[in-house]
């Protein structure tokens, strides 16, 4: 894991990484921009449940309040779902600005890969 003062790794995800368990990184744009509320939240939670049923740990990746998040809580997924398209769609170029401004960002595939790598996924 790359130590970064802006990175928060969910405790369940951190434990899975330490123990060598499989972790699946998921982008968050589908939650904020892909579907309307509440279907977006229901779908995101269902995908996480299916991943757990298959023996892996889900790590939905997002930026909340300028913090890079590797693994969201159900409450954070709900927050993202309710805010919807009011959340910035965050690509690589947006990371520094969102962190500096303390804003939220829904990760694209590229940004998801960057944050997942930082977290050791």
Predicted regions and their residues:
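N-terminal glycine-/serine-/threonine-rich phosphate-binding loop
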Residues: 1-54, 118
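Amphipathic coiled-coil/heptad-repeat helices and related helical stalk/stem segments
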Residues: 9, 108-109
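Internal, conserved structured core segments that host functional sites
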Residues: 109-121
């Amino acid at each position: 894991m790359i130590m970064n003062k802006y990175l928060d790794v969910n405790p369940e995800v951190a434990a899975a990484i330490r123990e060598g368990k499989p972790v699946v990184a998921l982008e968050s744009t589908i939650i904020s921009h892909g579907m309307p509320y509440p279907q977006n939240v229901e779908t995101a939670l269902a995908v996480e449940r299916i991943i757990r049923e298959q023996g892996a740990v889900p790590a939905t990746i997002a930026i909340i309040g300028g913090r890079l998040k590797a693994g969201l809580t159900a409450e954070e997924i709900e927050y993202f779902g309710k805010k919807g398209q009011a959340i910035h769609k965050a690509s690589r170029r947006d990371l520094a600005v969102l962190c500096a401004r303390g804003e939220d960002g829904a990760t694209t595939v590229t940004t998801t890969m960057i944050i997942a790598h930082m977290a050791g996924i």
